[in-house]
Curated annotation (Swiss-Prot):
It is a peripheral membrane protein. The coatomer is a cytosolic protein complex that binds to dilysine motifs and reversibly associates with Golgi non-clathrin-coated vesicles, which further mediate biosynthetic protein transport from the ER, via the Golgi up to the trans Golgi network. Coatomer complex is required for budding from Golgi membranes, and is essential for the retrograde Golgi-to-ER transport of dilysine-tagged proteins. Transmembrane segments: none annotated. Gene3D superfamilies: 1.25.40.470, YVTN repeat-like/Quinoprotein amine dehydrogenase. Coiled coil: none annotated. Pfam families: B-prop_COPA_B_2nd, COPI_C, TPR_COPA_B, WD40. The modification Phosphoserine is found at residues 409, 942. One of its GO terms (cellular component) is Golgi apparatus. WD repeats lie at residues 9-50, 51-90, 93-134, 135-174, 210-249, 254-293, 296-336, 370-411. This is Putative coatomer subunit alpha.
Length: 1207
């Protein structure tokens, strides 16, 4: 038996201590008059209470209420509320020191005893004294309620122990009952008698005499009819009582000074006593012999108490308080696959099947060590079916037990014993025995013969298993991996006082458990991560090689190899984990009983999937688990996954911050409209400009009415039309400065002059007119000012002020960004979230509402309304129907290459590449057109003009020189890493990744928003960009070609939808055919779902149930759940009930077909047809050499060598 100290405080002399029934708190009453509240787990002082004058002796918590009572030398019994930290009231009545005070376990009573030779019972609710027990002739040192009966025991310096019967008091204070007249008269008579001769509410039942000197303490046994007493005669006496008598059983002798306090062990047949001889002694209740003595050098013990529920004791002494327990409560156990071997409280080895929940006793180890000390550890050898147990009794002993037979619980005769502090198996037929005193390890065989003795190189505290032929040596500051064959340390790791080691399933990692830390290391003791806890760590178990579950006193937690930790659940009691599999955890409790419970592993599985970059698992957990909470959101932000955190948040402000963090400006815009606060719009404007998204920046500036910033934005993006509107707005606002600024941006000279005249700034107006050659206007200003030209001395005037003319309509595009490589998870997540958005939209709209939306979207998009008015809900995105050329055309730079410095490089560009884009960059537009005509049969190049100029401009950098000289030209290469000029190739702006992340994303968005015309224009622009793009590999070239084919499919499909909307109710049969053609197109899943649902709705209206059923089956393949799946199932059900079509239409779903863009009719695989080599559109015969209506570039039926994007 050993004293395991859990907490110790340092203070002045402590006279009393009390455990809280549920919280890890103790109250200590000090001799200096102060009361302290401690958290004994954390070792922290929580509060102090001052209210007594003089020493405080009695202290006790209430069992259920937030109250405690204290009694001191100021004769007061104080009742406190520890939550409000206030003294509620004082109970006055005692005439001398109050020694003990305590609460009744059931009634609102407080029991107190005093040096005034009385015992008082108080009702703390009514704050009255309800009984005074007199009879002792000296100080009453102790009084206590019986745990279950209506009895009180008291001890006094009059050398007696008295037992009081308070059943009368209980009946008197019980709930009132109806009584007859006779009972009422009898009660009145008794009341008169009590006034004359004293109360009979509490009467002395027994007077126990046996002590030779004063009695300091007495206590009832929790369950047996026993009483314990201790006194100044240095004896601890045991008494037994019955209903009619009480007598002394025996005396425990051994203390050599006054015994201050004593108690019964609540769970074992032991007695504990505390004495002024500076010892705490443990006695055998049955034999009344001393079991163990715990001594302090300088502190006398004054009080000892036990926790009402846990196996903890607290003792008050001269230097403070200590909390301790007498034995380790961790059951010795070992796991072999699904079989758990453990030692129960009866010291028998039990084999427990975790899957079947069946237990079998296989051996007994009652004779191992001391009767009061359970085995400390168990090591199991599954090959030989033997177990090795160790105990700390007798300076360390081990026992080798055969557990293969299913015999009775009697000890086996062939058990082998020997001295040793630790013993573990290190091979199939070898085990190691560690001696702490000798610092040696003996290797023994199963017959207990020593085969090898190893002297350890370091002072070792414990040894642990570390694989066959290896052990871990735990020292005070380090852990060593020790090779038993080579007798040397292989590797070391700095860790203080490692208590337990838990190996992973494949023995590749280990968790080193200390008192407050966990170190996770590799097999060679290389650190992976470390975890620190403020509460003691009790056990750990591996779920798999990357997840560790560990238990503290209060919680079950997890740890990942990245160092991430979290709480899985709160534990009602301390558990020792033995195995975890899936969502089941198996453990042993402190009663050495196996328990199992379910956990929710979603949180650590989610984090583990992120750690492994298993995005499919992450997506699955998001869709099927209830992952919520600020902790998950903060974790995702910390780990750099704001786009995932965005899916968990509902609060608009938090979603807005996350959207900005992950660069999702479209979502941020929607949220800004919801929040609608100036600071939010300002944040969005700043981020939009940082990302080069001038379209969203324009919306934010409109919302904030930043007119100057809007004007400048339109200037740098070349949007002259909106600059003109800004000038009109400035005029309406009477903002002269803004109007002048916009006239500068627009280069409107006459407007500037008029503004300056209106402002009375005639000199500047005159200079402006003269410098821009407006002589007539200059003369008008002079005449208005009564001046002549001779009177004015003009400075030398420079050239007229002009604004640059934009080469490209840059306001139609946002600034291009580098495309990040989207993971499988991000793509799946984006597609899934867009699908959910479509489904929610379809849930909210009825068919009639959807038709109204369709009708409204058939019209051409109106021009932007006056910017001074409120901003519309959504800006018109996409390409304009007509491309307006700038007022001043850009001069074509197709001069003779020999006239330029560096013309050799341009020649090399054309020589090194057969691609049209490289010839465009060289300035040889004619050669590029010939290449496109030869490769893809292009015949109409006017739509490519803007793209040609863009490529040409982006391949050069012009450096201005001194006035009068032409600028220096520097050519930009895409293979700048190549040193040889002979292999130079020009830089081609806009690659595949850029097109996908901007134009293609925008086109998808327009389709989703039901903006059909804009979407067609956007897809057509993608064809122009892709046709003159250069690939970095053959694979990328194939992707570009596939992108052109996809754009062609979208344009033809959207043409069918536009034609159907134009027809309306004129030709319902033709409209139904067009809806089928739209639904049969190979589109993205989210767009195909919309098309199929529209076609199903149209089929139901015209009673084509058979065709609707076929479309329903296709829809069900794309949408397995949600409203779309419900609509598909309804269509299939109606088709099964009525498998007929009311209209015969030109549509065969079982034959492969393409749609002719000219006639919007099917072209089946067996028909004659012509193809556009540019976009791949298929036409009926009869349109050869006409311009393709899909791409507007290629010639129908023109032959070419094929698309080429990689050289």
């Amino acid at each position: 038996m050993e004293m395991l100290t859990k907490f110790e405080s340092r203070s002045s002399r402590a006279k009393g201590v009390a455990f809280h029934p549920t919280q890890p708190w103790i109250l200590t009453s000090l001799h200096n008059g102060r009361i302290q509240l401690w958290d004994y787990r954390m070792g922290t002082l929580l509060d102090r209470f001052d209210g007594h004058d003089g020493p405080v002796r009695g202290i006790a918590f209430h069992p259920t209420q937030p109250l405690f009572v204290s009694g001191g030398d100021d004769y007061k019994v104080n009742v406190w509320n520890y939550k409000s930290r206030k003294l509620l009231f004082s109970l006055c009545g005692h005439m001398d020191y109050v020694r003990v005070c305590t609460f009744h376990h059931e009634y609102p009573w407080i029991l107190s005893c005093s040096d005034d030779q009385t015992i008082r019972i108080w009702n703390w609710q009514s704050r009255n004294c309800i009984a005074i027990l007199t009879g002792h002739s000296h100080y009453v040192m102790c009084a206590a309620f019986h745990p279950s009966e209506d009895l009180i025991v008291s001890a006094s310096l009059d050398q007696t122990v008295r037992v009081w019967d308070i059943s009368g008091l209980r009946m008197k204070n019980a709930a009132p009952v109806s009584m007859s007249l006779e009972d009422q008269l009898a009660q009145a008579h008794n009341s008169i008698s009590n006034d004359l001769f004293g109360s009979t509410d509490a009467i002395v039942k027994f007077v126990l005499e046996g002590h030779d000197r004063g009695v300091n303490w007495c206590a009832f046994h929790p369950t047996l009819p026993l009483i314990l007493s201790a006194g100044d005669d240095r004896l601890v006496k045991l008494w037994r009582m019955t209903a009619s008598k009480a007598w002394e059983v025996d005396t425990c002798r051994g203390h050599f000074n006054n015994v201050s306090c004593c108690l019964f062990h609540p769970h074992q047949e032991l007695i504990l006593s505390a004495s002024e001889d500076k010892t705490i002694r443990v006695w055998d209740l049955n034999r009344r012999t001393a079991v163990q003595t715990f001594r302090r050098d300088n502190d006398r013990f004054w009080f000892i108490t036990v926790h009402p529920k846990l196996n903890l004791f607290a003792a008050a002494h001269d230097s403070g308080v200590m909390v301790f327990k007498l034995e380790r409560e961790r059951p010795a156990h070992a796991l072999n696959i699904n079989t758990l071997l453990y030692v129960n409280k009866e010291k028998s080895i039990v084999s427990y099947d975790l899957l079947r929940a069946q237990s079998t006793t296989v051996a007994s180890v009652k004779h191992l060590g001391s009767a009061w000390l359970p085995p400390r550890s168990l090591s199991y050898n599954p090959a030989e079916k033997v177990a090795l147990l160790t105990s700390s009794a007798d300076n360390g002993v081990y026992e080798l037990v055969n557990v293969s037979s299913r015999s009775n619980s009697l000890p086996l005769k062939d058990n082998i014993k020997g001295p040793g502090d630790d013993a573990i198996f290190v091979a199939r037929n070898r085990f190691a025995v560690f001696s702490r005193s000798d610092q040696t390890i003996e290797i023994k065989d199963l017959s207990n013969k020593v085969t090898k003795t190893i002297q350890l190189p370091e002072k070792t505290r414990d040894i642990f298993f570390a694989g066959m032929g290896h052990v871990l040596l735990s020292t005070a500051t380090q852990v060593h991996l020790f090779d038993l064959q080579q007798k040397k340390i292989v590797s070391s790791f700095n860790a203080n006082r490692v208590k337990y080691v838990v190996w992973s399933n494949d023995n590749s990692q280990a968790a080193l458990l200390g008192k407050h830390y966990v170190y996770i290391v590799k097999k060679n003791l290389e650190l992976i991560t470390s975890i620190h806890e403020t509460i003691r760590i009790k056990s750990a178990v591996w779920v798999e090689n990357n997840v560790l579950l560990y238990a503290t006193l209060d919680h079950l937690k997890y740890a990942l190899m990245s160092g991430d930790t979290g709480v899985i659940k709160t534990l009602e009691s301390t558990l020792y984990l033995v195995k975890a599999k899936g969502n089941m955890v198996f453990a042993l409790n402190r009663a050495a009983e196996p328990v199992s419970f379910e956990i929710d592993p979603t949180e650590y599985l989610f984090k583990l999937a992120l750690l492994r970059k298993d995005y499919e698992q992450v997506l699955h957990l998001i869709q099927n688990s209830n992952l919520v909470g600020q902790a998950i959101i903060a974790y995702l932000q910390k780990k750099g996954y704001p786009e995932i955190a965005l899916q968990f948040v509902e609060d608009p402000s938090t979603r807005f911050e996350l959207a900005l963090e992950c660069g999702n400006l479209e979502t941020a815009l929607e949220l800004a409209r919801t929040i609608d606060r100036p600071e939010v719009w300002s944040r969005l404007a700043s981020d939009a400009m940082s990302y080069g998204n001038h379209k969203i920046a324009e919306i934010t500036f409109q919302k904030l009415r930043y007119f100057e910033k809007l004007s400048f934005l339109y200037l740098i993006t070349g949007n002259a039309e909106k600059l003109q509107k800004m000038a009109i707005i400035a005029e309406k606002r009477n903002d002269t400065l803004s109007l002048f600024q916009n006239s500068l941006y627009l280069n409107e000279v006459e407007s500037r002059i008029n503004i300056l005249e209106q402002a009375g700034m005639y000199p500047i107006a005159y200079l402006t007119a003269k410098s821009n050659g407006l002589e007539e206007k200059a003369q008008q200003i002079l005449s208005h000012c009564n001046k002549t030209e001779e009177e004015i001395k003009l400075p030398s005037l420079g050239s007229a002020f002009t604004t640059p003319v934009p080469v490209n309509e840059t306001y139609t595009h946002n600034w291009p960004l580098l495309d990040t490589s989207h993971s499988t998870f991000e793509k799946s997540l984006q597609e899934r979230m867009e699908q959910l958005a479509i489904e929610r939209q379809e849930e909210q709209e009825s068919e009639e509402e959807y038709e109204e939306v369709e009708q409204s979207l058939m019209d051409v998009v109106d021009e932007m309304s006056d910017l001074a008015e409120s901003v519309p809900e959504e800006e018109v995105d996409g390409w304009e129907v007509e491309d307006l050329a700038p007022e001043e055309a850009v001069n074509d730079v197709v001069d003779d290459a020999s006239a330029f410095v560096g013309a050799d490089e341009i020649f090399l560009w054309k020589r090194n590449s057969p691609l049209a884009a490289d010839h465009i960059a060289a300035g040889d537009f004619e050669s590029a057109m010939k290449i496109l005509n030869k490769q893809v049969g292009a015949i109409n190049f006017s739509p490519l003009k803007t793209r040609f100029l863009e490529i040409y401009t982006a391949s050069r950098v012009y450096l201005p020189t001194i006035s009068g000289l032409d600028p220096l030209v520097s050519y930009v290469r895409r293979n700048a890493e190549t040193a040889e000029r002979s292999q130079a190739l020009p830089f081609i702006t806009r690659n595949l990744a850029s097109i996908k992340s901007h134009e293609l994303h925008e086109a998808y968005r327009l389709v989703k928003a039901n903006k059909i015309l804009e979407a067609q224009i956007c897809f057509r622009s993608i064809i122009y960009l892709a046709l003159t793009t250069v690939a970095n590999s053959e694979e990328e070239a194939d992707e570009i070609s596939a992108l052109i084919d996809e754009c062609c499919r979208y344009i033809v499909a959207l043409s069918c939808e536009l034609e159907r909307r134009r027809l309306g109710e004129e030709d319902t049969k033709r409209a139904l055919e067009l809806s089928y053609y739209f639904a049969s197109a190979d589109l993205q899943p989210m767009h195909s779902i919309i098309a199929l649902r529209l076609a199903i709705n149209a089929s139901h209206k015209l009673k084509n149930y058979k065709s609707a059923s076929f479309l329903g089956n296709k829809l069900l393949q794309l949408a397995e759940s949600g409203p779309a799946a419900e609509a598909a199932n309804r269509a299939i059900t109606l088709g099964d009930r009525n498998p007929h079509d009311a209209f015969e239409i030109e549509y065969d779903p079982h034959v492969e077909m393409r749609i002719c863009p000219k006639t919007l009719t099917p072209v089946y695989s067996g028909d004659d047809f012509d193809v556009c080599s540019v976009c791949g559109a298929v036409y009926h015969k009869g349109y050869v050499n006409e311009v393709c209506t899909v791409c507007d570039v290629g010639g129908i039926g023109q032959k070419g060598t094929g698309r080429r994007f990689f050289a």
